[in-house]
Each structure stands twice: as structure tokens, then as C-alpha cells.
A protein has these predicted regions:
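Glycine-rich anion/phosphate-binding loops
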Residues: 22-27, 58-62, 126-134
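N-terminal carbohydrate-binding accessory modules
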Residues: 1-40
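Aromatic-lined substrate-binding rim segments of carbohydrate-active enzymes
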Residues: 26-104, 203-212
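Structural preference for beta-strand elements that scaffold enzyme active sites
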Residues: 11-13, 41-43, 74-78, 148-154
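A generic secondary-structure micro-motif detector
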Residues: 20, 53-56, 197
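Active-site beta-loop-alpha junctions enriched in small/polar residues
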Residues: 17-19, 47, 82-86, 155-160
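Polysaccharide-binding and catalytic clefts of secreted carbohydrate-active enzymes
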Residues: 93, 100-213
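Substrate-binding cleft of carbohydrate-active enzyme catalytic domains
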Residues: 5-7, 35, 39, 62-85, ...
Length: 213
């Protein structure tokens, strides 16, 4: 990864492990350590489950602490949005999201087994994820309006399917058949992966449109 900081210096960054910033104590401990390593940028997870533990109520404590400690150490921050997916799975989504399978449906394998992966074909999944991400971006625009500390934002993390090459849930099958995908593109894992890549991209690209508040 290469980008330019406001001082026109190349990024020399280090990425925290998945759950290394889940508390104020974690952040207080890790930021000085990153500075001692000679880094100028830290890639830090932004956890949806900790930011919106109750639907519609946002807690930016960890975000604020990350930025304040980074500033104290002279570090820049790249936030990684652990939203609907992280390494394919929906493990960092909030409990209220994960427990309401009817409202936020899961992807399924070819045998109809529900996977621990929110379906990207669900409008409810999209709206909930986007609402939280938009709240985070609005907060950052107020806390760091000139992007002097937060220099980048990664949208989702390693999205894709595990166990099954594509989603076989009812919503996904409807899209698959409507496009006559098998007829036009063939079958098999490669074709299935291309199908999913298209719809994951469509999911993320739709974020260009501002959500209804």
C-alpha cells in the first residue's frame, strides 16, 4: 500500500490484528508501541458491533480514543470498517443484526444450510450496514474535518464467500435466474465467484448514494 500523507511523506504503516483495538486499554497500549516501531500510520479496525451495540444508538468511544492517542504519538490512522463482513463472515456485526435472521438473511450453500455470512442480496443488510458506516463518516468529518489524522478508510474487509462459491439463498437465486447466469456464463466455481464478485461490488458501489436518514 502506498499513499501520500499531508506532509507528502510515504506511508510507513502497521496493521493491528483483528481484535487488538476492542477497548480503550488496548488502544492506550498499542499506539505508543506503534510509534516506537518507527511507523507513521496505523491501520485500525472500526468494529460495527462495538459502535452500534443497540440499533440506532452509536458509541464512538473507541474511534475517538484511537484518534486522540494517534495524535499524541504523531501517527496517522487508516480505519478498516469491520461491518457486515470481515474475512467473509459476519462475525463483527452487532448482536441485534446477527440474531434477526428473518430481517437480515444469511447466505446459504447449495444444500440450503445457512452460513454465518449476511447475504449481500438483502436490502435490509445493505441499509443497516450503510447507516452505521455513514454515521461513522459523519462523526469523522466533525472530529477530523481536514483529514489531518484519518487519511484513509477501508470499506469492509476481505468480503467473499467461504464454504460455498456463491450464495444460494432465495434472494440470491432470484438474481441468478433473472440474469440467466448459468446460460450466459456457464457453471462451476469460477462462474459462481464471478457472480458473487459482481454483486458484492454492486453492494459497495451503491454506497455512493447517500442513505435516507
Amino acid at each position: 500500500m502506498f499513499a501520500q500523507l499531508s506532509t507528502l511523506q510515504p506511508i510507513l504503516g502497521g496493521e493491528l490484528s483483528n481484535s487488538a483495538a476492542t477497548s480503550v486499554a488496548d488502544i492506550d497500549e498499542v499506539m505508543p508501541r506503534m510509534a516506537r516501531l518507527g511507523l507513521n500510520t496505523v491501520l485500525v479496525p472500526a468494529y460495527w458491533e462495538l459502535m452500534e451495540p443497540t440499533e440506532g444508538h452509536f458509541d464512538f468511544t473507541l474511534i475517538d480514543r484511537t484518534i486522540s492517542r494517534a495524535r499524541e504519538q504523531g501517527l496517522k490512522v487508516v480505519f478498516l470498517w469491520f461491518g457486515a463482513w470481515k474475512n467473509s463472515m459476519s462475525c463483527y456485526a452487532p448482536a441485534w443484526f446477527k440474531q434477526d435472521v428473518r430481517r437480515f438473511p444469511r447466505a446459504m450453500n447449495a444444500g440450503g444450510k445457512q452460513l454465518e455470512i449476511a447475504s449481500c442480496f438483502s436490502d435490509n443488510v445493505l441499509r443497516a450496514d450503510l447507516k452505521a458506516f455513514s454515521a461513522l463518516m459523519r462523526h469523522l468529518s466533525e472530529l477530523d474535518p481536514r483529514c489531518e489524522t484519518v487519511v484513509m478508510m477501508q470499506v469492509e474487509n476481505e468480503i467473499g464467500m467461504l464454504e460455498s462459491a456463491r450464495d444460494h439463498s432465495p434472494l440470491a437465486e432470484k438474481a441468478y435466474k433473472a440474469e440467466r447466469w448459468a446460460e450466459l456464463h456457464g457453471t462451476g466455481d469460477q462462474s459462481d465467484e464471478q457472480f458473487m464478485a459482481k454483486y458484492y461490488a454492486r453492494y459497495v458501489e451503491s454506497w455512493r448514494r447517500p442513505p435516507a436518514r
